[in-house]
């Protein structure tokens, strides 16, 4: 780790020289990139400086302890040593995260697709609960939230719900929500008090940036159908053909949008979802080909993988990929997801850091 830190500190000096050159302002894109790198490397330097200070204090305390005779001073020094070790351990975990090269996609916006799975009506209701949970989380993080498509259930909740979330760090924090979420609770209609188990699936699709050249959709590869929008129960809610169904012929990806009264707006939303799905399919293909990338993931990201269980009677939420169990499900459902998302990101960074060390050894 020491060697890699010193390499980054040297890189920080190089970046500082480049960013202080007035010519850099003639290239806004490079300036923006260097500014982000400078911020990350400066944070790394600050944390490393803290480590060095704490290690010096720790060594001084150990030296003093070896010579101390007074019981009270010994107890105080031992407490200080223990506290110092704990603080240094925390700082090294932060350093681990900072030493992993940032993913250029970390700040991409995402499209999240939630679908009711096993459990019928109860699964649809839980989709509604999770939609609210993610909405509250997005608000707490200062992100922009947008409903893109919704298929309501007859008794409430949603058979399917598609949302767009945009802001800083969206993809980095939400990417590990992909998979099967299982819920265990007593339905309101259950008279015997029996706990039912149902499940929903969540897909997290990074939304391609406008200048992403890898996701090009040719109009001639699209089949676009228009029809009248319908609500729950199948009744038509619009007298014009405002609903849009787009089929991408080369991949077979189909997207339908009917929430807006305007056909133009529905088509625009459908195209956003379509591009995200095409990009996701390509990324999934690449991940399957790269075993190193697979081993670095927190779980496989497969929609069929059970990643989390929400047990309402025990107020418990368990993330099975990292063995994290919390007894504050009530707060989690109110959008307090930071403990879970941060733990997943840290775990993923730790794996990436370990893999990087193995490759360099």
UniProtKB/Swiss-Prot annotation:
Signal peptide: none annotated. One of its GO terms (molecular function) is translation release factor activity, codon specific. SUPFAM superfamilies: Release factor. Keywords: Cytoplasm, Methylation, Protein biosynthesis. Its main location: cytoplasm. It comes from the Bacteria. It is found in: Cytoplasm. It holds the Pfam family PCRF. Belongs to the prokaryotic/mitochondrial release factor family. HAMAP family: Rel_fac_1. This is Peptide chain release factor 1. It comes from Chlamydia felis (strain Fe/C-56). The lineage of its organism: Bacteria, Pseudomonadati, Chlamydiota, Chlamydiia, Chlamydiales.
